[in-house]
């Protein structure tokens, strides 16, 4: 006979999750593997001759790249000789300024910085993250996708997402050739919701770069780097080729960051027996060495791997902290779904939500998860109210805000009509009034009429083949009567010329003002310092629609 309590527990959502015991030899260990190298560095005549116990004769491509470009050698020997526990204390001590820490962390080797953060528990890591994030003001990023690649729905959802507070929005495709329509719809909708929101379309790298050069996206993120050489070469890549791609984006005025995440090497079968965090540290150093301003990390689409082993979610926070400690923008994941448990996914979110990161999620699904083409997110559109209440409960700025239904309906309708004008002006397959009406009130693709997919794909490919650029979109908006949106779209193109939003951790706010680590420096130094939720922003977060006004109660 079974215990009734254990029968009840067996039915709990968390017991549908996958867990595995540590398997050190294959890399199924989140942190502190006995196979991780001991920190070391030797420098002869300004060149690294030993890195983390490995002589230069045994360096792989990643070692060479990091040794040449990724470490501040001027202070490396000094910092490597410092006690790691002392360095860990300095990281989480608010009395030690970020400006004092960065010269130390950027002079460490990957094994050294992993050793440092391994001395910290999650509360200490959150204390450190609050101080070490690059931009003073935390922010949020959204996923905006649907299973039908319906551009009208993407535009409406993007407008709502921007209205709710997302500063970056990302789409991808179910069908690769739909990409130009998705990119245009996302950018148009985002500018309707709030001018200045940055957008991207995650694709195969050549197409993604092409769309950026045509002016249909504002940034790129899914340029992946890995912590072992076989995973790199399996994808016909090297750290140098990724660095070249990064410079291609930057030279066109497009913001970009790399992507990596613990567990990717295990998933690809090339972990070389090292811990997930150590291999991820190598990815972060590759990013720094390539001169890229930021990184999306936090396991991202590999979250099922670290979350299955002990201390895995702690390791995810640790990799975010290492990223910020190397003075990089950190888009800290809270991305792909990994658990059936609401309690567990909230605990995972709080690691980044409470201290704040440059982008707490990368991204939060602004659509219901059944429409999320990034395989679902840790938070989706059905969590908006919960998220806003948690911000209010804890007085934490998580990047979003409460909204009114009538405002959302209006903004969705305007976005759908604006895209209708773009398609008409550019001679693309027409968007019907029925589609506009459906997108105005839709929750997801189940609420949308079908489009002629064959026609859409044909014309979408013409965008690429005929080099139809963002200025054509601006012209179509102006001719269609949406002069305000046309101006906002033009301003986004101008931003690529000025280049201000290429600075570390940049977002565009207000009337085109760029906030970045340059002019919004994180000055946290303990209580009453750094970013504080106050004034109009706190009033906005407090004012949730469900709150009763005592003055209006009879």
Swiss-Prot record:
Keywords attached to this entry: Bacterial microcompartment, Cobalamin, Cobalt, Lyase
Principal location class: other
Pathway the protein contributes to: Polyol metabolism; 1,2-propanediol degradation
Record SUPFAM superfamilies: Cobalamin (vitamin B12)-dependent enzymes
Molecular-function GO term, any one: propanediol dehydratase activity
Reactions that this protein is recorded to catalyse: propane-1,2-diol = propanal + H2O
Enzyme Commission (EC) number: 4.2.1.28
Induction: BMC production is induced by growth on 1,2-PD vitamin B12 medium. By either propanediol or glycerol.
Pfam families: Dehydratase_LU (PF02286)
Subcellular location, record wording: Bacterial microcompartment
One GO biological process term: propanediol catabolic process
InterPro entries given in the database record: Cbl-dep_enz_cat, Diol/glycerol_deHase_lsu_sf, Diol/glycerol_deHydtase_lsu
Cofactors, names only: adenosylcob(III)alamin
UniProt activity-regulation remark: Inhibited by glycerol.
Cellular component, GO, one term: propanediol degradation polyhedral organelle
The keyword Phosphoprotein belongs to this UniProt entry's keyword annotation: no
The protein's enzyme class: lyase
Disruption phenotype: Cells lacking this gene are defective in aerobic degradation of propanediol and display no propanediol dehydratase activity. A triple pduC-pduD-pduE deletion releases no acetaldehyde when grown on propanediol.
Subunit structure: The propanediol dehydratase enzyme is a heterotrimeric complex composed of a large (PduC), a medium (PduD) and a small (PduE) subunit.
Entry's family note: Belongs to the diol/glycerol dehydratase large subunit family.
The protein's role, per its UniProt record: Part of the PduCDE complex that catalyzes the dehydration of 1,2-propanediol (1,2-PD) to propionaldehyde. Required for S.typhimurium growth on 1,2-PD as the sole carbon and energy source. This subunit is directly targeted to the BMC. The 1,2-PD-specific bacterial microcompartment (BMC) concentrates low levels of 1,2-PD catabolic enzymes, concentrates volatile reaction intermediates thus enhancing pathway flux and keeps the level of toxic, mutagenic propionaldehyde low.
Other facts: Bacterial microcompartments (BMC) 100-200 nm in cross section are formed during aerobic growth on minimal 1,2-PD-B12 or anaerobic growth on 1,2-PD-tetrathionate medium, but not during aerobic growth on glucose, anerobic growth on glucose or pyruvate-tetrathionate. BMCs can constitute up to 10% of total cell protein.
Name of protein: Propanediol dehydratase large subunit
Organism: Salmonella typhimurium (strain LT2 / SGSC1412 / ATCC 700720)
């Amino acid at each position: 006979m079974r215990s009734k309590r254990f029968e009840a527990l067996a039915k709990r959502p968390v017991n549908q999750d996958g867990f595995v015991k540590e398997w050190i030899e294959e890399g199924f260990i989140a942190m502190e593997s006995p196979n991780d190298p001991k920190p070391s560095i030797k420098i002869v005549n300004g060149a690294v001759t030993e890195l983390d116990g490995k002589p230069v004769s045994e360096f792989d491509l990643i070692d060479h790249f990091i040794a040449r470009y990724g470490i501040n050698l001027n202070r490396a020997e000094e910092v490597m000789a410092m006690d790691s526990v002392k360095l860990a204390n300095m990281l989480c001590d608010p009395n030690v300024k970020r400006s004092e820490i960065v010269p130390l962390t950027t002079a460490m080797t990957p094994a050294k910085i992993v050793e440092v953060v391994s001395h910290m528990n999650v509360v200490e890591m959150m204390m450190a993250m609050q101080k070490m994030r690059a931009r003073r003001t935390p922010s949020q990023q959204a996923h905006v996708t649907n299973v039908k690649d319906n551009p009208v729905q993407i535009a409406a959802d993007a407008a709502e997402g921007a209205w709710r507070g997302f500063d970056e929005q990302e789409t991808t495709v179910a069908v690769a050739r739909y990409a130009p329509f998705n990119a245009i719809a996302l950018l148009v909708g985002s500018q309707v919701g709030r001018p200045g929101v940055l957008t991207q379309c995650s694709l195969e790298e050549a197409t993604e770069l092409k769309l950026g050069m045509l002016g249909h996206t504002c940034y790129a993120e899914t340029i992946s780097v890995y912590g072992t050489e076989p995973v790199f070469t399996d994808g016909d890549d090297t750290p140098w080729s990724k660095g070249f791609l990064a410079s291609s984006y930057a030279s066109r005025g497009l913001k970009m960051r790399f992507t990596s995440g613990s567990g990717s090497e295990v998933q690809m079968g090339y972990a070389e027996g090292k811990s997930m965090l150590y291999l991820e540290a190598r990815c972060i150093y590759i990013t720094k060495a390539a001169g890229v301003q930021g990184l999306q990390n936090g396991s991202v689409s590999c979250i099922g791997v670290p979350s299955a082993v002990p201390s895995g979610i702690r390791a995810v926070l640790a990799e975010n902290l290492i990223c910020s400690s190397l003075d990089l923008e950190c888009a800290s994941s809270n991305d792909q779904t990994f658990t059936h448990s609401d309690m567990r996914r909230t605990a995972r979110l709080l690691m980044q939500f409470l201290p704040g990161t440059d982008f707490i999620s990368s991204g939060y699904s602004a659509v219901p998860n059944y429409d999320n083409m990034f395989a679902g997110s840790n938070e989706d559109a059905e969590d908006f109210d919960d998220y806003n209440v948690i911000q209010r409960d804890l007085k934490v700025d998580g990047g979003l805000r409460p909204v009114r239904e009538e405002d959302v309906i209006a903004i969705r309708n305007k976005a759908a009509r604006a895209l209708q004008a773009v398609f008409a002006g550019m001679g693309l397959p027409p968007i019907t009034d029925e589609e506009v009406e459906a997108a105005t009130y839709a929750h997801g693709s189940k609420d949308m009429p079908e489009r002629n997919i064959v026609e859409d794909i044909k014309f979408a490919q013409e965008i690429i083949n005929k080099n139809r650029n963002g200025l054509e979109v601006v012209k179509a908006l102006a001719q269609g009567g949406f002069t305000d949106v046309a101006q906002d779209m033009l301003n986004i193109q101008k931003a690529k010329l000025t280049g201000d939003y290429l600075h570390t951790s940049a977002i565009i706010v207000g009337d085109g003002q760029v906030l970045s680590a340059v002019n919004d420096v994180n000055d946290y130094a303990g209580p009453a310092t750094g970013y504080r939720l106050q004034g109009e922003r706190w009033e906005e977060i407090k004012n949730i629609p469900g709150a009763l006004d005592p003055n209006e109660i009879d």
